[in-house]
Amino acid sequence: MSEDLPILSPIEARVLGCLIEKKELTPDVYPLTLNAALAAANQKTARDPVMALEQTEVHRALKLLEQKGLVRQMFGSRVERYEHQMAQRFSLTTPQTALIGLLLLRGPQTAHELLARAERMARFSSIEDLRGELDMLIGRRPPLVQEIPRGPGQREDRYVHLLAGPVDVAALSAQRSAPAMPHSDLEARLEALEQEVAALRARLDALGG
C-alpha cells in the first residue's frame, strides 16, 4: 500500500537536505539547533541555489516538516534541536538517504556528480552501485526520485527528487546544464571552513542556551 508523498516548499526542501547532510558531516553537533540549521541553509558552497533565509523562515520550515513527519524536535536540551526522520519515514538505507539529501540541496544531478558529492556522506563501491540505489528510489510506489533524459549539450541523464511535487521532465531535459567544474582545493577548503563554523556555532548554542 502506497501513501502520497509530502509536498515540500523550496525552503522546506533546503532545511531537510541540511539536516540529512549535517547528520553525516558533523555528527558531534547533530541534531541541529535552529541557528545551526540557519547557517547550513545559507551556506555558499554545496548549495544550488544559494539562499539568504531569515531565522523565522527556517523555524517555520522546521515546524512544517515536523507536522509532515519528516523532522522531529529533540527535548532534554536547553535549546531546541531537530533531527530528520527520512530513513524512518520511508525505510531508506544510509546511501539512499544521502542521495535524497544531495538532490534536495543541489537540484537535478547526474550519477557521476552524485558519486563525487556523496563521498563524505555515504560509501558507494562503484557508479553501478550508486545507480542501483537510485533505481530503488525510482521504483518505489510512490517514487522518491525520477530520471530526467539527457537533453541538448548534456552527456548524461540526470536525477531529481519528487518531494516538491511532479516535475516538468521536458523543461528539465531541455535545460542546458553549466559545465561540470572540478571540485577545486579552494572550494574544498571553503566548504570545510563552513562546516567548522557551523559546528562551532552549534557548540556555542549548547553552552549559552
From Swiss-Prot:
InterPro entries: DUF480, WH-like_DNA-bd_sf, WH_DNA-bd_sf. Pfam families: DUF480 (PF04337). It comes from the Bacteria. PANTHER family: UPF0502 PROTEIN YCEH (PTHR38768:SF1). Belongs to the UPF0502 family. This is UPF0502 protein mll4256. It comes from Mesorhizobium japonicum (strain LMG 29417 / CECT 9101 / MAFF 303099) (Mesorhizobium loti (strain MAFF 303099)).
